[in-house]
A protein has these predicted regions:
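Charge-rich, low-complexity N-terminal segments
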Residues: 1-95
Length: 95
């Protein structure tokens, strides 16, 4: 069961990911962050995204993996999380 602090951090990470993706992604594909899971030690976070159209999922995931360090640097500038997690992106199936 997640603590209130973890829930807040997960919500913040999803919100920041949505803003970053809206700013940096191309206009041909809709990438929407749905949720984030933070590890118990708060050092790693997985962001689950949905992609439309569905056949662009691999391209969108490749884009996100290329930009994960830039996104983490953006988070570093805009948040005051005690531990800034390393980010991985995964496609959300069936959500």
């Amino acid at each position: 069961m997640s603590s209130m602090r973890e829930n807040k951090a997960e919500s913040l990470i999803v919100e920041l990911a949505a803003k970053y993706i809206a700013r940096e992604a191309g206009r041909g594909t809709l990438i929407t962050p749905l949720r984030a899971d933070i590890s118990p030690d708060r050092k790693n976070a997985t962001i689950y995204v949905s992609v439309f159209p569905d056949d662009q999922g691999d391209h969108a995931l490749a884009f996100l993996k290329r930009h994960k360090d830039l996104f983490r640097n953006s988070m570093k500038r805009t948040t005051r999380l005690a531990i800034l997690p390393y980010i991985t992106f995964e496609l959300a199936y069936g959500e």
